[in-house]
């Protein structure tokens, strides 16, 4: 619907309602169409590993939006993008679900869920899903530290990415006494 914006959906598995794909919608300035497609595939495969690890019942998927021709994540018409995403998810008829990822927001998901039910993003909840995701990471770290009798202040942590989730992880680690936290 808008020039300079392409939506790609990758699903790492069969397109079936019994085990639908799930992964967030990412909005970036990819140099090429191939780069966007490859990223979508790589991320969908990674999501399958996450879903298998936690036995969620989902396979991996990812929605990747490529901005080009002068478009950026800040200039994209969000309403039109959410309409396009909703149309694609509706066409896939429950075999792929999405939520927030890089450069998409809860407000975007609120708009998307008005048009399709295939959104997992804490809609209508007081829970900040970014904080909830970060806290699962912190809980895992604390569990491992407890199991192996490790002192967080003696460990070194590298947090990949310092966005909506990573920043909460990094701040929480420091708050828990970690002395060496890198982003």
Residue ranges and their predicted role:
Residues 128-183:
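Glycine-rich phosphate/diphosphate-binding loop of Rossmann-like nucleotide-binding domains
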Residues 1-124:
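N-terminal ligand-binding/catalytic initiation module
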């Amino acid at each position: 619907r808008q020039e300079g914006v392409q939506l790609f959906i990758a699903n790492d598995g069969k397109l079936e309602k019994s085990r639908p794909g799930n992964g967030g919608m990412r909005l970036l300035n990819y140099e090429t169409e191939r780069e966007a497609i490859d990223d979508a595939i790589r991320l969908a495969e990674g999501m399958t590993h996450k879903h298998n690890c936690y036995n969620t019942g989902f396979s991996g998927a990812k929605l990747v939006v490529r901005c080009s021709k002068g478009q950026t994540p800040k200039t994209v018409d969000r309403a039109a993008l959410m309409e396009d995403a909703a149309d694609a998810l509706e066409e896939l008829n429950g075999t792929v679900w999405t939520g927030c990822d890089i450069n998409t927001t809860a407000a975007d998901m609120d708009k998307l869920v008005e048009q399709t039910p295939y959104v997992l993003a804490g809609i209508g909840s007081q829970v900040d899903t970014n904080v909830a995701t970060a806290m699962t990471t912190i809980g895992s770290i604390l569990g491992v530290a407890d199991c192996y009798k490790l002192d967080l202040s003696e460990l070194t942590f590298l947090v990949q990415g310092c966005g909506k989730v990573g920043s909460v992880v990094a701040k929480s680690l420091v708050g828990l006494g970690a002395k060496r936290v890198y982003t």
